[in-house]
A protein has these predicted regions:
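Sequence/structural signature of beta-propeller domains
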Residues: 1-192
Length: 192
């Protein structure tokens, strides 16, 4: 807990354990935090992990987290998320050289554990668009490509991206932050 008036930390405690390489994540309109793992490491690697990683976890502002990965939101190199406060749709960035911009359509707004559909952004009429060479300042229609297997058994860093890209999804390079304002999700990319 942080006291904004005094600038002092009042209380500090762990809210989640058992995750790996957590990155930006983001807040939800219903008062929780989505923390994102920026790795797909798992058992059998050189890190001695018991469980696979590369997921999003929800951490309530008050109370205990379940430490259950939200597997239908995808297993990939996550960076950040933002949430549309009206629909509950979650937008997700991926931080690697060949990266996708994803959205998760929850089966039930505000209850991500109820499952849903993961999709990857595609530019209409420009399948497999490489945004590193795109023209700036041009509005382009988009659509979304379904990800049929958001939690592949032997996941690599590119497993989910390859599915979306194969369906015509766009390639970004190292997506970082994302924010939802008004009716739009904004994203920033490190290298295109």
């Amino acid at each position: 807990e942080f006291d904004t008036a005094s600038g002092a930390v009042v209380e500090s405690k762990a809210s989640l354990a058992g995750t790996a390489v957590n990155c930006a994540g983001g807040p939800t309109p219903w008062g929780s935090w989505l923390t994102c793992e920026e790795t797909v490491s798992g058992p059998g690697g050189d890190n001695a992990y018991e469980h696979p990683h590369g997921y999003i976890f929800e951490v309530p502002a008050n109370g205990r987290a379940t430490a259950e990965p939200l597997v239908e939101m995808g297993r990939f190199v996550h960076e950040a998320v933002c949430v549309d406060p009206v629909t509950g749709v979650v937008y997700e960035t991926e931080d690697q050289n060949a990266a996708g911009f994803y959205r998760f359509l929850p089966a039930e707004a505000g209850n991500l554990g109820a499952g849903g559909q993961l999709e990857m952004l595609a530019f209409s009429g420009m399948p497999q668009m490489d945004t590193r060479t795109a023209e700036t300042g041009v509005w382009t229609p988009v659509h979304w490509v379904p990800i049929d297997d958001p939690d592949p058994v032997d996941a690599t860093a590119s497993s989910v991206f390859v599915q979306g890209f194969g369906g015509g999804g766009a390639r970004f390079a190292r997506l970082e932050g994302t924010w939802f304002a008004g009716t739009r999700a904004y994203i920033v990319s490190t290298t295109g």
